[in-house]
Swiss-Prot record:
Glycans are attached at N174, N246. SMART domains: CADG. GO terms for cellular component: cytoplasm; cytoskeleton; sarcoglycan complex; sarcolemma. Residues 312-387 are cytoplasmic. The modification Phosphoserine is found at S377. Keywords: Cell membrane, Cytoplasm, Cytoskeleton, Glycoprotein, Membrane, Phosphoprotein, Signal, Transmembrane, Transmembrane helix. Residues 1-24 form the signal peptide. Cross-link to form 2 major subcomplexes: one consisting of SGCB, SGCD and SGCG and the other consisting of SGCB and SGCD. The association between SGCB and SGCG is particularly strong while SGCA is loosely associated with the other sarcoglycans. Interacts with the syntrophin SNTA1. The gene is SGCA. It comes from Oryctolagus cuniculus (Rabbit). The chain crosses the membrane at residues 291-311. This is Alpha-sarcoglycan. Belongs to the sarcoglycan alpha/epsilon family. It holds the Pfam family Sarcoglycan_2_C.
Length: 387
């Protein structure tokens, strides 16, 4: 019995593991609050590929979610251009997300249908060093979000931006696709791109060039369809085509004024020359008003009822007055009609002939006698023979 159990145990474990099923790998990452976090999902780190197989030729897709939840946390996004391109997890954590989060990623090989899992342990913490109070957001229309997430394009953007900003350390704070900000999907013609928002922070103040771009005069020129004011050389061109009408500057070094909470008072208004409080109302007796409101309609209704009763009971013409006002010829004609009617009724009542019984077929209308049928109707067939 023990030998049979030892024989079936490895087989059962293999069935539960499934084809291609392996234990999920675990990787620890350290995102920083307020800084962009980018993690590349490569097929080689998930699937056990043969040595001669090139990772770029194997279609692989990914599915990522927060452990114990069906989707990713709010600050984290996933994107992949196609199964032949790597996937990216990117975003910027907020102070509320500080702590430990576990992201479970499953890779699917679209050729062999193999799957592999990986757990990403994110230990989110605060960044070290001085804060970055000066923040600028650019809209780059010449790139998609997948083209800016790798380290090389991001470093090239910071290097090119250093020519427009005063010397200082620049940090990427966030990268967002223009589609996530309400942008439209471009047409697949002319190499059009979706666009990407890149947010950069620095401890150095804004340069004069950036302040001029974000000035009200530049916004007015953009509203008229004209290019904004740019007093310096565009070092981002031609590799990065920036929409200078969509540049926003945020200075967090100046604290925002806190809204004062209104203090509840005692409900008594202070002395105000324009406010005239109402005088005290004297007590009034509403008994007379109530009596007038109720008794006057009742008296009017009573008078109308008495007038109607007098007209109906005391002002009737009477039968005698009606007969006197009627002519004699009309009265004779009327009486004749009544007398003739009574005479006809008496004659009809004195007839000895019984009332006709129309349902009986043997009844004689002229004599009124009842005769038995000559033929026994019970012996007559319903349908006569046809000769």
């Amino acid at each position: 019995m023990a030998a049979a159990a030892l024989l079936w145990l490895p087989l059962l474990v293999g069935c539960l593991a499934g084809p291609g099923g392996t234990e999920a790998q675990q990787t620890t990452l350290y995102p920083l609050v307020g800084r962009v976090f980018v993690h590349t999902l490569e097929p080689a780190s998930f699937l056990h590929l043969p040595e001669h197989a090139a990772p770029a030729t194997i279609p692989v897709t990914y599915h990522a979610h927060l452990q114990g939840h069906p989707d990713l946390p709010r600050w984290l996004r996933y994107t992949q251009r196609s199964p032949h391109h790597p996937g990216f997890l990117y975003g910027a954590a907020t102070p509320e997300d500080r702590g430990r989060q576990v992201i479970e990623v499953t890779a699917y090989n679209r050729d062999s249908f193999d799957t592999a899992g990986q757990s990403l342990v994110l230990l989110i913490r605060d960044p070290e060093g001085s804060p970055l109070p000066y923040q600028t957001e650019f809209l780059v229309r010449s790139h998609d979000v997948e083209e800016v997430l790798p380290p090389t394009p991001a470093s090239h953007f910071l290097t090119a931006l250093a020519g427009l900003w005063e010397p200082g350390e620049l940090k990427l704070l966030n990268i967002t696709s223009a589609l996530d900000r309400g942008g439209r999907v471009p047409l697949p013609i002319g190499g059009q791109k979706e666009g990407v928002y890149i947010k950069v922070g620095s401890a150095s103040p804004f340069s004069t060039c950036l302040k001029m771009v974000a000035s009200p005069d530049s916004h007015a020129r953009c509203a008229r369809g004209q290019p904004p004011l740019l007093s310096c050389y565009d070092t981002l061109a031609p590799h990065f085509r920036v929409d200078w009408c969509n540049v926003s500057l945020v200075d967090t070094s100046v604290p925002e004024p806190v809204d004062e909470v209104p203090t509840p008072g005692d409900g008594i208004l202070e002395h105000d020359p324009f406010f005239c409080p109402p005088t005290e109302a004297t007590a009034r007796d509403f008994l007379a008003d109530a009596l007038v409101t109720l008794l006057v309609p009742l008296l009017v209704a009573l008078l109308l009822a008495l007038l109607l009763a007098y007209i109906m009971c005391c002002r009737r013409e009477g039968r005698l007055k009606r007969d006197l006002a009627t002519s004699d010829i009309q009265m004779v004609h009327h009486c004749t009609i009544h007398e003739n009617t009574e005479e006809l009724r008496q004659m009809a009542a004195s007839r000895e002939v019984p009332r006709p019984l129309f349902p009986l077929p043997m009844f004689n209308v002229r004599t009124g006698e009842r005769m038995p049928p000559r033929v026994d109707s019970a012996q007559v067939p319903l349908i006569l023979d046809q000769h």
